[in-house]
Amino acid sequence: MKKVVITILFFFQTTFLYASDQEKKLNLLFNELKSDISTKSSEIEEKIWTLWSTHPTNKNLTLMLDKGTKLVQNQNLNKAIMVFTEVIKIDPSWAEAWNKRATVYYMIGEYKKSQKDIDKVLELEERHFGALAGQGLVNIQLKNYEKAIKSYKKAKDIYPSMQSAEIMIKKIEDLIKEQTI
């Protein structure tokens, strides 16, 4: 019995250390991203995406997420949703699993489901500039243009050199001007 308790304690302590280590790395990268407005920002962005897409403690979940991503690339969207949903059931605290499923919901036109998953992503990782950009796209589809602009501006606050956010803000502002004429 004592060995079982020690094993369980070791598992939880190790799991916490891996998750904590990943969070520290993300904090450093986000500080760099915010202060660096150069070509290096794309390298920092890539490192952040790699950390987000790697489960901190369970390699099998990372493999499942990769499998779902490949299904998306092959346009097998319903199966991808099933894979991402399974990952979410196993670890509902992994923001990137929610983000992947939100992306697929957006791709199939399920904008409200996509928004619901994006809300969960941002609850778990408020700095998720990808989810904020996705939220902008969802709000454009729902014709909530002011909300879309807010989402992109939040993304720009986190990632100042995010060009796609800058482009989308301008396009939405132009769209709003056209509608008021």
Regions found by a protein language model. Name each.
Residues L17-D66:
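N-terminal leader/linker segments that initiate helical-solenoid repeat arrays
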Residues V4-Q13:
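Sec-dependent N-terminal signal peptides
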Residues N27-I37, I140-L175:
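TPR/TPR-like (Sel1-like) alpha-helical repeat modules
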Residues L33-K34, W49-W52, I88, L122, ...:
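A conserved position within tetratricopeptide repeats
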Residues T54, Q73, M107, Q141-L142, ...:
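Register position in tetratricopeptide repeats
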Residues T39-S42, P56, F129-G130, Y159-K171, ...:
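Boundary/linker segments of alpha-helical solenoid repeat arrays
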Residues N58-E125, G130:
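Alpha-helical adaptor scaffolds
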